[in-house]
Structure formats: C-alpha cells, structure tokens
C-alpha cells in the first residue's frame, strides 16, 4: 500500500487504493453526469471527480466500495483534489479490506476508557456518579467505536471517546484555575454531552444519520435517556434536571441545536471546552499537510477560513 494521501503534495502522481466514503451524482454544464467522490485512506480524505460517468460507474463506485486509482494530486479553489486518471473496483486479488482505510483515534479504546473511568471515580456526588456510570456502561461498546461526527471534527473511528478524553483533560486544567467549578457536573456533562450520537449516527464506518438522528438528534435522545436512567435507578432531585440541562445547552444557541442557552456556570464552560476541542481538531487536521509559510485549505465550519502555518514552525511530515 502507498504512503497515504496525507503525504502527497500538489502535482505529484499517485497510484493507490481508497475507500469511497461518499459518492454524489451531479450533472456538468455540458449536460453529462459526473460523480463527486470523497475518498479516504488511513491518513486522511480527499475529493475526486469522475467525469462522464456511466450507469455502470454509478452502480460500481458507491459508498463503502474500495477502489484502485491512478491519478495526480491537484488543487481547485484552494482545496486539494485528486484528478483521476484511471479507476477500477478491487477484487479479492488485491488483498485489501475496509479496516485498511479507516482513520482511528491516536489512543486505544482501552486507554481512553481507563482515563474516563478515573474521572467518574473522582466524582463525589453519588447521584451524578451513578447516572453517568450507568449511561456510559449501557453504551460503552458503541461509545468507544463511534466517531464524534460525520464531518468537521473527530470524524474517525473512536473519535467520540477521544473528543471526550481531550475535553476532560482541558476541564481538569480549568478546574485547577477556577475552583468554584463543580467538577462532578463538568466531568459528567462532558462524558454525556455527545453520548446520544451512538443512536444519532449509524456506526464507525461509512457513517450516516439514522432515522432517530434525523428526527430527534443526539441532544433530545440523551436528555430523554437521563430521565429514564434516573427512574430506573430510583434517583430524584435537582441533579437529574441539571444533568439534562448540561446536555440540552451544550450547543449554546437555538440556531446551533440547543433549545436552551447555558444557564449554569458548568454548562457555559462545557460549551466552551467543546468548542475549543472541536476547533483544535479541525485546525490540526487542516494544517497536517501544510508546510511552513503556507495556508491550509478552507475550513467550512470555521467561517470558511484558511489558517497559516508560520515559517518558523517545523514541517509536519517527512515527505522523502
């Protein structure tokens, strides 16, 4: 297998295998159909166009298919794109499998679970601790495998758990600076805030939105589950409502998906930590293939901005 799409520079020829993450049909200005393919390998993703595609191409080059491509890395409107020279479906003779093309979190699921469990052990409020532990255990397998999103940030295998671990570590540092923060609430809110995504999303590979995800969303899903968990465990009190509020308000604004803004201190900080970690992941991913003195591709979720890597920073990759 080749060195990976992340390691190629604009103008370089390449020949490699890719997993098709999505295939979208459209019609060009000349009236001919084409496919926009999002291709991935173990290092990253890239867009490619398959011009003048036939009905057979549409049936062959679908989401989840593994293909062999020869082409050249190019740039279009500030974004890298793979110019396809030839493309074919793979066969058993190629000896490739889907797991070869999936990017994963830099920490193992066991390591992440151990870290998260330690934060739960540190909780002093038994009601908050029990509800958090119960919900995590209920969804543990999916939680450790799922991405945090379909696009934008932590959209890789185990991305959801990695997002939570990073947020918890930020929260611990902030709590040391601001001792008025209730770490039980903050840690529980971080662990639970995106847990509804195990029902909102379809799985760790070829991730799409489920019917529940489209009609309810991860916030509503988890708010309901917190209530059900409290009933199941026989827990009453304000802790239940506060945990629900933490999940409900973590997007901060109605136009961002939260029906209520943060109205307690820990909910506001939870939103900020979530935003920091998501944006850091987006910027880090965009700057991975950028050399010092260059700008990244535009990041749609960050006002379509490009980010600059200062000249005095070390190159990110050994491209030899």
UniProtKB/Swiss-Prot annotation:
One Pfam family this sequence matches: tRNA_anti-codon
Keywords noted in UniProt: DNA-binding, Exonuclease, Hydrolase, Nuclease
DNA-binding region listed in the record: 18-90
Disulfide bonds: none
GO molecular function, one term: 3'-5'-RNA exonuclease activity
Function according to Swiss-Prot or TrEMBL: Shows a 3'-5' exoribonuclease activity.
Protein name: 3'-5' exoribonuclease YhaM
Organism of provenance: Halalkalibacterium halodurans (strain ATCC BAA-125 / DSM 18197 / FERM 7344 / JCM 9153 / C-125)
Encoding gene (name): yhaM
């Amino acid at each position: 297998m080749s060195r990976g799409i992340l390691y190629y520079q604009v103008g370089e020829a390449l020949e490699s295998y890719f997993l098709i993450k999505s295939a979208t049909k459209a019609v060009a200005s000349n009236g001919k159909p084409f496919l926009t393919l999002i291709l991935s390998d173990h290092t990253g993703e890239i867009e490619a166009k398959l011009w003048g595609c036939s009905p057979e191409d549409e049936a062959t080059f679908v989401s989840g298919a593994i293909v062999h491509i020869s082409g050249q890395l190019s740039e279009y409107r500030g974004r890298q794109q793979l110019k396809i020279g030839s493309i074919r479906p793979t066969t058993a003779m190629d000896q490739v499998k889907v797991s070869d093309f999936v990017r994963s979190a830099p920490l193992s699921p066991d390591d992440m679970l151990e870290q998260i469990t330690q934060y739960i052990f540190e909780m002093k409020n038994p009601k908050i601790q029990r509800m958090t532990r119960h919900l995590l255990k209920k969804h543990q397998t999916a939680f450790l495998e799922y991405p945090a999103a379909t696009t934008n940030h932590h959209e890789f295998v185990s991305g959801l758990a990695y997002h939570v671990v990073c947020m918890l570590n930020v929260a611990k540092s902030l709590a040391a600076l601001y001792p008025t923060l209730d770490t039980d609430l903050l840690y529980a809110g971080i662990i639970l805030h995106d847990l509804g995504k195990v029902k909102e999303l379809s799985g760790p590979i070829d991730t799409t939105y489920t019917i529940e995800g489209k009609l309810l969303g991860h916030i509503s899903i988890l708010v309901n589950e917190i209530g059900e968990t409290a009933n199941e465990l026989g827990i009453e009190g304000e802790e239940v409502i506060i945990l629900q509020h933490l999940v409900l308000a973590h997007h901060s604004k109605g136009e961002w998906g939260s029906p209520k803004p943060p109205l307690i201190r820990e909910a506001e900080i939870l939103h900020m930590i979530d935003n920091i970690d998501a944006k850091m992941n987006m910027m880090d991913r965009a700057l991975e293939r950028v050399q010092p003195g260059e700008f990244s591709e535009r990041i749609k979720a960050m006002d379509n901005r490009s980010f600059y890597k200062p000249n005095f920073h070390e190159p990110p990759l050994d491209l030899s």
